[in-house]
Amino acid sequence: MQTKYQYGIYIGRFQPFHLGHLRTLNLALEKAEQVIIILGSHRVAADTRNPWRSPERMAMIEACLSPQILKRVHFLTVRDWLYSDNLWLAAVQQQVLKITGGSNSVVVLGHRKDASSYYLNLFPQWDYLETGHYPDFSSTAIRGAYFEGKEGDYLDKVPPAIADYLQTFQKSERYIALCDEYQFLQAYKQAWATAPYAPTFITTDAVVVQAGHVLMVRRQAKPGLGLIALPGGFIKQNETLVEGMLRELKEETRLKVPLPVLRGSIVDSHVFDAPGRSLRGRTITHAYFIQLPGGELPAVKGGDDAQKAWWMSLADLYAQEEQIYEDHFQIIQHFVSKV
């Protein structure tokens, strides 16, 4: 391993950027002439796990650094690819290549704290530097204290510039909405706390596509109140997966297509089971791809758990990625990329 590198790479979500992150960044600046900070979870919808968007996180980190240091720091963003490490890796490699020009003098810095750190093993072409564990600093714990209003439990865990940002953000409508969602999720999990085993929830989702449009709804229930989602929901004990999917589809969209036609138009299905895909807990969804023939889009109307139902063009879908619930954007991508 070299003692000095041309580039250091530091990957994280930084939700929020805390003193442990700052220590690692300072180490990267010692070991490398330039540091590339890669912000993960780019363009995901704001929730209690990812409250801040990429430009906000970038601004938070920049506020902690001097103008001289900032000249040595590059920021990149990368989307989540929960179901394809290769696509995530390709995105990281393409972004990094734009800055490094293919240099071999590159080191990745990080700490293998748990299963979520497995990505650190995916870069054999670059050296790896273990930064060590900072047990006093956890973004998860900081967010929890933040949404519970316990300033004494987190203000000393973040740089002063971040503390100022967090206090200002508390005045925003997003913070108020996220606090409400945080309390909902805590109560939701508490309701299952006495179960003999940790629950695993089974849901279904319908990906209905016609003529370059996908059928979407706007949620009117927490979590994800107001976000754009696929029609779907929990399976009932007395129905099959397909029956549950079709029931939820009809309840939430009032789609004017007969059930036999919908059932006959199912062309694909897939299980989406990323362990962290839902903040409610372990939730596995069975998604069904329904391809309707071209022509006039059938009438729809929101119902049940949906404020609204409408046909969204695929172009609008990509433009509004930051408003799409959980991993539903990736579910849609999985199916439409095949046709």
UniProtKB/Swiss-Prot annotation:
GO terms classed as biological process: NAD biosynthetic process
CDD domains: NMNAT_Nudix, NUDIX_NadM_like
Superkingdom of the source species: Bacteria
Cofactor(s) required, per the database record: Mg(2+); Mn(2+)
Key words, A-Z: ATP-binding, Cytoplasm, Hydrolase, Magnesium, Manganese, Multifunctional enzyme, NAD, Nucleotide-binding, Nucleotidyltransferase, Pyridine nucleotide biosynthesis, Transferase
Reactions catalysed, as given in the entry: beta-nicotinamide D-ribonucleotide + ATP + H(+) = diphosphate + NAD(+)
Function statement: The Nudix hydrolase domain is active on ADP-ribose, (2')-phospho-ADP-ribose, IDP-ribose and NADPH.
Name of the protein this chain belongs to: Bifunctional NMN adenylyltransferase/Nudix hydrolase
Organism whose genome encodes this protein: Synechocystis sp. (strain ATCC 27184 / PCC 6803 / Kazusa)
